[in-house]
Each structure stands twice: as C-alpha cells, then as structure tokens.
From Swiss-Prot:
NCBIfam families to which the protein is assigned, alphabetical: argG, PRK00509.1
Record-given protein name: Argininosuccinate synthase
Subunit structure: Homotetramer.
Underlying gene: argG
Similarity comment: family membership: Belongs to the argininosuccinate synthase family. Type 1 subfamily.
PANTHER family: ARGININOSUCCINATE SYNTHASE
Length: 409
C-alpha cells in the first residue's frame, strides 16, 4: 500500500475472488468500497451480486449494477466487426473488447461518487490488468489504481479460502477446491483458461463447453438465414429488425444449435507469454462471415485490400488494451468511412460447425454480371486492351530479366 485511499470503485462480479478483494480493500486500505457490476450478457443473474455486497457491508447507495448489453454491442462489438477484427488469425477478441467499457463505467462512477481510486480483479500474469489500467489512465490520468493480485501475499487457494472464512465471506461448495478452469463470458463469447486447459497437447474436455453443442451432434439438416446490413452493421435477421444486443443474442442461439464458434487457441499475450484458451463465439463467428460477404460486393478492391492490411494492427490494439488510443480512433474513422455503402443482405447456411455464405445482394453492389459473363450479350469490353495492361505491368519484370540475362545470372 503506497497511498492513502478514501474511496475505491471495484469492478465486482459477486464471485468469490472479487468478494475477497472487496474485503481486502476494506481491511488493507481502510477505504470505503463502491461496487460496480456490469451486465454484458454473461448470462448470470446479477441480483445476487447486490445481496453479496450488502452482506459484506457495502452501503446500498454504493452498489452500482448496470445493464450494458446494448451499449456493449452497439458501441464496441459492432465497430470492431466493421473492421473484421481477428487477432492472430483466429481470435474474435470477445474478452478484449469488453474491458474498455467496464473501465469507462468505473471512471464515470468514480467521478460521480468522488472516489480517488479504482480496482479490478485481474491477475498479474494476464492481459486484463493492462486493458483495464490503460483505460483508467486514458480517461482519468491522475486516478489511483489498486491491483490486489499484484499486492497481496495470498500464494495459494487455501490462503484465499482462509481469508474468506475469517471474514465470513460465503463460499460455495464447489469453490473450496481449485476450479478446473476459469471462465469469462459476455454476449459476444465465453472463454475458458487454466488448469485442465494448460497442456496444449490435450484435447479440451467436453464439459468445458457452455455456449455451443458438439458440431457432430448438430442437426443433420442445415439452417438457412438471412442477415441485413446497413452501413456495416447487422440490423435484421430473416427480415426482422432487431436492436444490436437482441440481434447478437439471436445469432448466438442459431450458432449454438449448429455447433458454430468453437476455437482452441494458443495465443501470444501482450505481457510476453503464450497461453492456451478455449473460446466459444457462436454469434460472432456468423456475423464475421456475413459481414465479409456483404463487403465482397460493396467494397472497391483498393478499399477492401487496404482494410485487410489495417485489420491486424487494429485487432492488436484492441487485444493489447489501446481502445482509447488515438491510433485506434484514427483507424476506426477510416474503417467507418469505408462502410458507407456496406448495406444489403447476405444468405447463410449453418451446418455442423460451419458458416457457409450462399448468397449476397445489395443496391450498392459493384458486381456487374453483364461485365463478367462469358456469354453473348456482354457489355463492351475489348479483350485486346488486356495486352497493353499486361505489358505495362510486366515492364519492371522484363527489365529485371534483361539484367539477369546480361550478367549471366
């Protein structure tokens, strides 16, 4: 403890670990604790978090629980999917994209209640500590940050449990031993890491999966759906207009039923180590295929290729926690500009873990069937023009070839 803290806003789930952190903040810092619990669509009842906080001595006016599902999808998930953001070729950034919103809300609450510190439950080995704290500092540069996992001396699960028992923190029976793996979930995905998943040579046990059925157990008949887009954002499924959160929840249902969205990944953490995670992103997996499908006919080649070049950097910025950085905002502005004509409808076939694009249509389509056809009636296109095009593009290659020939190489 390096600084006197009067009031601290804790990102609080109501689970055992953050309940221990809550009591630790009270006993170690002597601070007044304010709890913030976010509903990001993790699928859990949040009222128990309120009751747990009250039980641990938090004043009712210091308990904040907010339904952020619509804001999460509208202002974070959808902008990210306009970029087709994928980290290291596979990861759809489900955990990463949730952290800046939580950090933003914590800072807003800190300003509202006059808190001089914020706290989180991320460990000292992971990426989340970086993501939370970069967000805090970006939004309130003079904020004090308390990261208990980097400060306290609880070196084992047994010591944590002993602390909980000492301070009469309720402990579920299944929490007394080490959990077989840790879970993070929101409306975009569910992730599992640690323990039984730490050996990358071993297959993920079936009991780890919570958001998807086994693709082999999925229906033998495919499911066909249509998704409508307006300026890069999905707005309707099968002709039914939905809010962002409702739409993603519906895609999750469809993906779950068809075994879509499982990913076993060894990724490179920002802090320097490799980690193995199991991700389930059913709705997001469908959405990515659909968005790329509508872009195929509405984006100019140059814009599409530039977007694909920018995407890895954009994804890396989100993964590493730089959502509020100017370079992410610069890239977002370019990406959003590219989406002004990305409107139309795609048709998809969902089948045993696969998302298959089977149709796309748009009033802004750049696809000209009369131009590309080999049949009679094609629009004016002089095949002889290709000769000059090829010769000009071959000029430097011919020059290089002449040099090699001259030097006998």
């Amino acid at each position: 403890m390096s600084k006197k803290v009067e009031k601290v806003v804790l990102a609080y789930s109501g689970g055992l670990d953050t309940s221990i952190i809550l009591k630790w903040l009270q006993t170690t810092y002597g601070a007044e604790v304010v709890t913030f619990t976010a509903d990001l669509g993790q699928g859990e009842e949040l009222e128990p978090a309120r009751q747990k906080a009250l039980l641990l001595g938090i004043k009712p006016e210091n308990i904040f629980i907010e339904d952020l599902r619509e804001e999460f999808v509208r202002d974070y998930v959808f902008p990210m999917f306009r970029a087709n953001a994928v980290y290291e070729g596979q990861y759809l950034l489900g955990t990463s994209i949730a952290r800046p919103l939580i950090a933003k809300k914590q800072i807003e609450i800190a300003e509202k209640v006059g808190a001089d510190a914020v706290s989180h439950g991320a460990t000292g080995k992971g990426n989340d500590q970086v993501r939370f704290e970069l967000g805090y500092y970006a939004l309130k540069p003079d904020i004090t940050i308390i990261a208990p996992w980097r400060e306290w001396d609880f070196k084992s699960r047994e010591k944590l449990i002993a602390f909980a028992e000492q301070h009469q923190i309720p402990i579920a029976k299944d929490k007394r031993g080490e959990a077989p793996f840790s879970v993070d979930a929101n409306l975009l995905h569910a992730s599992s890491e640690g323990k039984v998943l730490e050996d990358p040579a071993q297959e993920v046990p079936d009991y780890v999966y919570s958001r998807t059925i086994d693709p082999q157990a999925a229906p033998d008949q495919p499911t066909y759906i249509t998704i409508d887009f307006e300026k890069g954002d999905a707005v309707a499924i099968d002709g039914r207009t939905m809010s962002p959160a409702t739409l993603l929840a519906k895609l999750n249902e469809l993906g779950r039923a068809n075994g879509i969205g499982r990913l076993d990944l060894v990724e490179n953490r920002f802090v320097g180590m490799k980690s193995r995670g199991m991700y389930e992103t059913p709705g997001g997996t469908i959405l990515l295929v659909a968005h790329r499908g509508i872009e195929q006919i509405t984006l100019d080649r140059g814009a599409a290729h530039l977007k694909d070049e920018l995407m890895p950097k954009y994804a890396e910025l989100i993964y590493n926690g730089f959502w509020f950085a100017p370079e992410r905002e610069m890239l977002q502005a370019a990406i959003d500009h590219s989406q002004q004509y990305v409107s139309g409808q795609v048709r998809l076939k969902l089948y045993k873990g696969n998302v298959i694009l089977v149709g796309r249509d748009s009033r802004y389509s750049l696809y000209d069937q009369d131009l590309v056809t080999f049949e009679e009636g094609a629009v004016a296109y002089d095949h002889r023009d290709a000769a000059g095009f090829i010769k000009l593009n071959a000029l430097r290659l011919r020059t290089l070839g002449q040099r090699k020939k001259k030097l006998g190489l």
